[in-house]
Design a protein with these regions (language model features):
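PP2C/PPM-type serine/threonine phosphatase catalytic domain
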Residues: 3-294
Length: 294
């Protein structure tokens, strides 16, 4: 991953970590007690097969009412010193602020919703740059989900998807990247991703960041499905949303089920990690999942 104008170009990329309900939190993946007690969420992170450290981080939380699920994933930029800590601090800060704010519920007004996410990302940025150690950089994606509403904010190229049980998948985030900038100018995805510096990100949290206002998108799910937040260590292996939906359906069909016949989010999360590693594991891989049942 290469943030533009941060040094020249920066590549992002220790052990393997998986955290699901019932297991202990680690430095790279953190669930609050309330989130860990639920059976409809899961979170997993893996170093991959090519890197020496895991610079991804994820944090899951639930508000006091139990109605708002918060999923956050951050991806550190490896050529910044402190990237690992940056991702951890940013993800925890965003999760904690959103979970605390959700005690009043998601704002109904669009402008207020955007303001909420802008404050969240600003607080994450400030927490990173005010640290005592080296200041790193990272991407950041945060999602708040209720039964009838999903709101997503992102900076960089960590992505959020909605995979309904029936119907077309929806990508709920837009990358801040050179490839996306080229697509905005009319290039096809294939052409843009072949370009020099295609994976350079144009916005980030932390070191030298000048604009930390996220893109914000809202969606109203109408049926059962899966909300996924993931680092590019996963989606780079399946960039097409339609292909990604087929992968999800296959993993769901193979996952362990509970007493009600519902696929285990933990099993699906582990399947996504395994898929990326089977494709070469070129980067750290992190996923956060929520299952919505009608």
């Amino acid at each position: 991953k290469h943030p533009l104008s941060l040094r020249t170009f920066m590549n992002k990329s220790d052990q393997s970590y998986t955290v699901t309900p019932g297991t202990a939190a680690t430095l790279r993946v953190d669930l609050t007690d309330a989130a860990a007690a639920r059976g409809d969420v899961a979170c997993a992170s893996h170093i991959g097969l090519r890197h020496e450290t895991n610079q991804d981080a994820a944090a899951l939380g639930i508000d006091g009412s139990g109605h708002h699920i918060v999923l956050v994933v951050a991806d550190g930029v490896s050529s910044t010193e402190g990237a690992e800590e940056c991702a951890r601090v940013a993800s925890h800060t965003a999760r904690d602020y959103l979970a605390a704010t959700m005690d009043q519920g998601l704002p109904i007004n669009d402008d207020d919703t955007v303001t909420l996410f802008e404050r969240t990302f600003q607080k994450a940025h400030e927490a990173v740059v005010s640290g005592s150690g080296p200041i790193g950089a990272c991407t950041l994606a945060a999602a708040v989900a209720t039964h009838d509403r999903i709101v997503v904010g992102n900076i960089g190229d960590t992505r959020t998807y909605w995979f309904p049980d029936d119907g077309d998948p929806i990508r709920l985030s837009i990358d801040d990247s050179m490839a996306q900038a080229q697509m905005d100018l009319g290039l096809s995805r294939e052409e843009a991703e072949r370009g020099i510096g295609a994976h350079a990100i144009t916005k980030w949290i932390g070191a030298s960041a000048t604009d930390v206002a996220p893109r914000v998108m809202a969606y109203q799910p109408q049926q059962s499905g899966w909300l996924l937040v993931c680092s590019d260590g996963l989606w780079n292996h399946v960039p097409d949303a339609g292909d990604f939906a087929l992968l999800m359906a296959d993993l769901v069909s193979k996952a362990h089920t509970d007493d009600h016949g519902h696929a285990s989010p933990a099993g699906v999360a582990d399947g996504l990690i395994a898929y990326a590693n089977n494709c070469g594991g070129h980067d750290n891989i992190t996923v956060a999942l929520w299952r919505r049942d009608s």
